[in-house]
UniProtKB/Swiss-Prot annotation:
Residues 1-58 form the IBB domain. This is Importin subunit alpha-1b. It is found in: Cytoplasm, Perinuclear region. It comes from the Eukaryota. GO terms for biological process: NLS-bearing protein import into nucleus. Pfam families: Arm, Arm_3, IBB. The keyword Lipid biosynthesis does not apply. SUPFAM superfamilies: ARM repeat. The lineage of its organism: Eukaryota, Viridiplantae, Streptophyta, Embryophyta, Tracheophyta.
Length: 534
């Protein structure tokens, strides 16, 4: 799809539900691209349980047989009534001991008995312990236990939320105890990570500002990691949070992306990717926060866990207007994108890089020229020819968009780089949208060939000949019988415009040609079955 504002673009958008900003001619990311988020690291980002086991104990637990584990757990569960009784005690020392036992039970590595603990009815007691400002150690143990309960299913989290924990945890972000503050940060991260509804409840309870106060130069690394992760959960999810509520996070994120810690960098970049995913005013706010120079540096980060969200954020920004896209070019992101295309990166990264480039080539002629000058076209064509289908699709958009907005010379350059053959090859792919994208790219190329012919460069459209030589003509013919009306109509139009005129004398008038064309037939009387070009 050429993505220029036009009536056809409107038809395509309604037919295929493509997320296209018709005014700016750029593609928003579609839901089927979220597979880049499906790494285990990202799966675990929503909620985290604090296990608290020292390394040696954790190793021993991992090595122990399953039966031994379940037997030991059963023994502990048999002790629950006594633990419940102890939690209800009026003796602070007994309360602490019992709460610590519950915390340890909820911290076991495999299948912690969250439901069983909830069913004992101790959650309201833990909530009460959160408010014991005179006893920070008890607050800490209760907060840890509730954090792990909230790390379970949505129903588990709901129990914590409906017990009134959220405003208390927000208040604990101002506790004089660093351990209590950090545990409150973690608990709120688990609640916010459960669902957009829970996230909005935390934000409405005033969770953002006291969270941002934890992100200071005196914070220890574990606090920075937890607070950045929680902040990313505050920004995450669809429907998105109210942007004005989370916009203050940008200045903190601008500092956090200069961290040398990979975990902090990863979560800070994911937060930026969520905040930049949307309308141009959101994109502008991200640009104005000053994150861009560092974001481009992070496109070269050796860790994929940092690189992916940094790339995602850059990709979001080029869905904006031409000026916002220019910001990406001006900060020298194109050489980094070239590196992502040519180095040995995984499929999801190459796909995302091609998607980003496709939105740059949907820009103005100067932006298309910047992509050409960065020597990106040749590797893009190589991917279009040889990569996995998911990457080919994005590369096809990138090339087709360049043919749509490019000058004649730019389009001639694309042809010289070998784009015709791979575009022709994709005409047989099962995705009708990509067939349309390739047809439009080829049609734009044919228009330039026609203009060259009319300028006296020869008697034939040399690009029509190149498409024929690349077996594209036969493929375009076959598209006359495609189920998709738009593809069928475009194929017929292209055949009529660029191959039929030579055969005009041999063509019958009337209805005989209505079933399609078969070019190259030397008989003067062509059968009603259609014409065969070639």
């Amino acid at each position: 799809m050429s993505l220029r504002p036009s009536e056809r673009a409107e038809v395509r958008r309604s037919r295929y539900k493509v997320a296209v900003d018709a005014d700016e001619g750029r593609r928003r990311r579609e839901d089927n691209m979220v597979e880049i988020r499906k790494s285990r690291r990202e799966e675990s980002l929503l909620k985290k349980r604090r296990d608290g086991l020292p390394a040696a104990a954790a190793a021993a637990a991992a090595a122990s047989p399953l039966l031994a584990h379940s037997s030991a757990l059963q023994q502990k569960l048999e002790g629950l009534p006594a633990m419940v009784q102890a939690v209800q005690s009026d003796d602070s020392a007994v309360q602490l001991e019992a709460t610590t036992q519950f915390r340890k039970l909820l911290s076991i590595e495999r299948s912690p008995p969250i439901e069983e603990v909830i069913n004992t009815g101790v959650v309201p007691r833990f909530i009460a312990f959160l408010q014991r400002e005179d006893y920070p150690q008890l607050q800490f143990e209760a907060a840890w236990a509730l954090t792990n309960i909230a790390s379970g299913t949505s129903d588990n989290t709901k129990v914590v939320v409906e017990s009134g924990a959220v405003p208390i945890f927000v208040k604990l972000l101002s506790s004089p105890s660093e351990d209590v503050r950090e545990q409150a940060v973690w608990a709120l991260g688990n609640v916010a990570g459960d669902s957009p509804k829970c996230r909005d409840l935390v934000l409405a309870s005033g969770g953002l500002y006291p969270l941002l106060q934890q992100l200071n130069e005196h914070a220890k690394l574990s606090m920075l990691r937890n607070a950045t992760w929680t902040l990313s959960n505050f920004c995450r999810g669809k429907p998105q949070p109210n942007f004005e509520q989370v916009k203050p996070a940008l200045s903190a994120l601008q500092r956090l992306i200069h961290s040398q810690d990979e975990e902090v960098l990863t979560d800070a970049c994911w937060a930026l990717s969520y905040l930049s995913d949307g309308t141009n005013d959101k994109i502008q706010a991200v640009i104005e926060s000053g994150v861009f120079p560092r974001l481009v540096e992070l496109l070269m980060h050796p860790s994929a866990s940092v690189l992916i969200p940094a790339l995602r954020t850059v990709g979001n920004i080029v869905t904006g207007d031409d000026m916002q896209t220019q910001c990406v070019i001006d900060h020298q992101a194109l050489p980094c994108l070239l590196n992502l295309l040519t180095n040995n990166h995984k499929k999801s990264i190459k796909k995302e890089a091609c998607w980003t480039i496709s939105n740059i080539t949907a820009g103005n002629r100067e932006q298309i020229q910047a992509v050409i000058n960065a020597n990106i076209i040749a590797p893009l064509v190589h991917l279009l020819q040889t990569a996995e289908f998911d990457i080919k699709k994005e590369a096809a958009w990138a090339i087709s968009n360049a043919t749509s907005g490019g000058t004649h010379d730019q389009i001639k350059y694309l042809v010289a780089q070998g784009c015709i053959k791979p575009l022709c090859d994709l005409l047989v792919c099962p995705d009708p949208r990509i067939v349309t994208v390739c047809l439009e790219g080829l049609e734009n190329i044919l228009k330039v060939g026609e203009a060259e012919k009319n300028l006296g460069a020869g008697d034939v459209n040399s690009y029509a000949q190149m498409i024929d030589d690349a077996e594209g003509l036969e493929k375009i013919e076959n598209l006359q019988s495609h189920d998709n009306t738009e593809i069928y109509e475009k194929a017929v139009k292209m055949l009529e415009s660029y191959w039929l005129e030579e055969e005009d004398d041999a063509m019958p008038s009337g209805d005989n040609a209505q079933n399609g064309f078969n070019f190259g037939n030397q008989q003067p009387n062509v059968p009603s079955g259609g014409f065969n070009f070639g």
